A protein has these predicted regions:
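C-terminal non-catalytic regions of proteins with extracellular/luminal or membrane-system context
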Residues: 1-173
């Protein structure tokens, strides 16, 4: 659902040949169902779709996300605990171990258009958790934020959105 389209950012202009794709969820696309629902295992993720349409994306960013967390950890929802099925992954934009100044400068030079991907999966037998269970460090422990639910933005996602909004002329979330 398109809620806002300020300055006609979408559809992308025919002149837009490059974009920066921010957000770990861009590298671990969500296509799923839970409980008695099902999902067609054949799908196209955002990065493949951009490539198919002839739009280049910044691989320095996507490589960092893939290194940070190589994929979604598989969880059997019927037998999982909330801290397993409700995990959120996102490095903080302010953490220079992930977002180096060089990377951020390169991204600004690469394109003035940014796409931010945020993902959640919940459904039958896989309820949205009342806390946030998140990993913000590569290989780090799961951190619990009791002040926010799974359906709210994480602090890291808010920081990312604030950064991208302040630094890019065209932003798609």
């Amino acid at each position: 659902v398109l809620v806002q389209n300020n300055d006609n950012t979408l559809p992308l202009s025919a002149d837009t040949k490059k974009v920066n794709v921010f957000g770990w969820a861009s590298t671990a696309w969500l296509g799923g169902g839970s409980g008695s629902g099902g999902v067609n295992a054949v799908n196209t993720d955002l990065l493949a779709a951009l490539t198919a349409y002839g739009i280049e994306y910044n691989t320095e960013l996507t490589d960092m996300y893939k290194d940070f967390q190589p994929g979604r950890e598989y969880v059997r929802t019927l037998s999982s605990r909330p801290e397993q099925s409700g995990r959120l992954y996102e490095p903080d934009i302010n953490n220079t171990a992930y977002y180096t100044q060089s990377m951020l400068d390169n991204a600004k030079s690469f394109s003035d258009t940014a796409v931010v991907v945020i993902g959640r999966l919940a459904g039958e037998s896989n309820d949205a958790t009342k806390q946030q269970y998140k990993r913000t460090e590569k290989g780090g422990d799961i951190v619990v934020d009791d002040t926010r639910t799974m359906l709210e933005l994480t602090t890291e996602e808010e920081n990312l959105l604030n950064y991208v909004g302040a630094n890019y002329a065209h932003v798609v979330v």
